[in-house]
């Protein structure tokens, strides 16, 4: 039975999972790596840490499964999106640490672009807004701030890529410089309607075309790993950004299906089919996947803080020692208190898009303690998801008929408390699948589809299995009261921004 290996390169760790042809998991390995915070709002990774942990976990997973390179039909890569690496085209040496998707250093540059009236043009081409979150302004910053970088780029000496592209380059020994349409669609440089890099956008941000990778289908032959990495060459046949990979792993192939992934942040995607839907509620229009040259689009809402709110409770406040303690602690909170956490630690994502504001707690009393803080942290994830859910239903013309169930995945879905509260606030069922590793599964599926190991999308969807459905149990009056309180808290926070 052949294996398909998924590389899942995330914000805080790298993982590798071997899937069997029946979609069961044979083995997995995970290794964390450090994040660097050189200034307020700046987040960086060492590219060598990304590479070393990726290779180490691949080898560890292969060892656990007793698999050799000959046993693996294909590799699929999924990655933290928007994070950028720029490297020397000959040596492969990065010119700077990777600038991570959470990084806000280009906020002022983005503000200037908006003030110049450029956002409507950018949004029309990319489906995105002008925000430090996306790759384009990060690349521009590197070219303008690393000594000699712009001149080297103009001479064709530098390559740019998102993390998938960087890993592909390294895996193939520098032979392949490519990415897929999902990752390209997150750069602010890619026209999602034409499916190509856009000259007007490249000129706007000052990015030479010679730096850019080839853009391919999400399921395609990308190249072959050099033999010395895994004791033999393995073909690389699938690439997708992490949220699009999770959408595929959740089998959201039908327009109207929606999934939400809970990791460091929270990301909800609604499949809109072959037609890109323009949002009137500050959602993003993005590429869900591209197969056989045909793009499927999605509406996306991006929240920057979800699981990291629990990390803050643990590492910042010392309220808990383990994430699993958060739900039971929240259960002990005083129901008479209404404490709201707006976790804008790095600004606010959809649907508010304010990079300047910072987090705040509302409704504190003398009796507020650890239980109330845990309660507020978990509920903040649910409230933010509600904001995305409401925006998607407003933008999607067939929402009442289609977007009736939310499929969830990611580490936080292990918390029954959080998932039940999510169903209560959405007033909709929340479905947790049997296979929680949906991001890795999506990458594996794309690779296995190209390799002929996995079936066509609809047959794959037929194999999706439900672990638990959380049904809403909160009264309408309580729901409305809680949502109104959240709305006031968000409004109060936004009012602290002098730019508002």
From Swiss-Prot:
ATP binds at residues 11-13, 264, 307, 311, 411. The keyword ATP-binding applies. ADP binds at residues 11, 15, 264, 307, 411. SUPFAM superfamilies: Actin-like ATPase domain. GO terms for biological process: glycerol catabolic process; glycerol metabolic process; glycerol-3-phosphate metabolic process. InterPro entries: ATPase_NBD, Carb_kinase_FGGY, Carb_kinase_FGGY_CS, FGGY_C, FGGY_N, Glycerol_kin. Pfam families: FGGY_C, FGGY_N. It is an enzyme of class 2 (transferase). It comes from the Bacteria. Sn-glycerol 3-phosphate binds at residues 11, 81-82, 133, 242. Pathway: Polyol metabolism; glycerol degradation via glycerol kinase pathway; sn-glycerol 3-phosphate from glycerol: step 1/1. PANTHER family: GLYCEROL KINASE, SUGAR KINASE. This is Glycerol kinase. The lineage of its organism: Bacteria, Pseudomonadati, Pseudomonadota, Alphaproteobacteria, Hyphomicrobiales. The gene is glpK.
């Amino acid at each position: 039975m052949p294996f398909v290996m998924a590389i899942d390169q995330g914000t805080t760790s790298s993982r590798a999972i071997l899937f069997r042809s029946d979609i069961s998991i044979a083995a997995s390995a995970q290794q964390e790596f450090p994040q660097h915070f050189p200034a307020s709002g700046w987040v960086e990774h060492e590219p060598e840490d990304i590479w070393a942990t990726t290779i180490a976990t691949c080898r560890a997973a292969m060892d656990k499964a007793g698999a050799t390179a000959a046993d693996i039909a294909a590799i699929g890569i999924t990655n933290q999106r928007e994070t950028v690496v720029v490297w020397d085209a000959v040596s492969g040496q990065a010119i700077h640490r990777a600038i991570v998707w959470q990084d806000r250093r280009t906020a002022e540059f983005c503000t200037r672009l908006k003030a110049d009236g450029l956002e409507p043009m950018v949004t029309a081409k990319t489906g995105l807004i002008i925000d430090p979150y996306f790759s384009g302004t990060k690349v521009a910053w590197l070219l303008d701030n690393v000594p000699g970088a712009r001149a080297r780029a103009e001479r064709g000496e530098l390559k740019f890529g998102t993390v998938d592209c960087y890993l592909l380059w390294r895996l193939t020994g520098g032979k392949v410089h490519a990415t897929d349409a999902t990752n390209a669609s997150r750069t602010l440089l890619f026209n999602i309607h034409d499916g190509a890099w856009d000259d007007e956008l490249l000129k706007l941000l000052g990015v030479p075309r010679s730096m850019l990778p080839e853009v391919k289908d999400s399921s395609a032959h990308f190249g072959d790993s050099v033999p010395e990495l895994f004791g033999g060459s393995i073909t690389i046949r699938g690439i997708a950004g992490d949220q699009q990979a999770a959408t595929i792993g959740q089998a959201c192939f039908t327009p109207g299906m929606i999934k939400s992934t809970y990791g460091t942040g929270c990301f909800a995607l609604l499949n809109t089919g072959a037609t890109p839907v323009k949002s009137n509620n500050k959602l993003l229009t993005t590429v869900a996947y591209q197969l056989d040259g045909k793009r499927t689009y999605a509406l996306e809402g991006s929240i920057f803080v979800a699981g990291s709110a629990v990390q803050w409770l643990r590492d910042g406040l010392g309220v808990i020692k383990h994430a699993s303690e958060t739900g039971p602690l929240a259960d002990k909170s005083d129901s008479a208190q209404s404490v709201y956490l707006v976790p804008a630690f790095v600004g606010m994502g959809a649907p508010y898009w304010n990079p300047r504001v910072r987090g705040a707690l509302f409704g504190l009393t003398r009796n507020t303690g650890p239980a109330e803080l845990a309660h507020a942290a978990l509920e903040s994830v649910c409230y933010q998801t509600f904001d995305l859910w409401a925006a998607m239903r407003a933008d999607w013309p067939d929402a009442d008929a289609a977007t009736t169930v939310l499929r969830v995945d990611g580490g936080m879905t292990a918390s029954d408390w959080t998932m039940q509260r999510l169903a209560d606030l959405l007033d909709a069922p929340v479905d947790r699948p049997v296979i929680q590793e949906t991001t890795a599964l999506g990458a594996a599926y794309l690779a296995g589809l190209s390799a002929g190991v996995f079936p066509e999308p609809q047959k794959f969807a037929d194999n999706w299995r439900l672990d638990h459905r959380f049904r809403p149990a909160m009264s309408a009056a309580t729901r409305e009261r809680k949502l109104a309180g959240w709305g006031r808290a968000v409004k109060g926070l936004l009012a602290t921004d002098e730019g508002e």
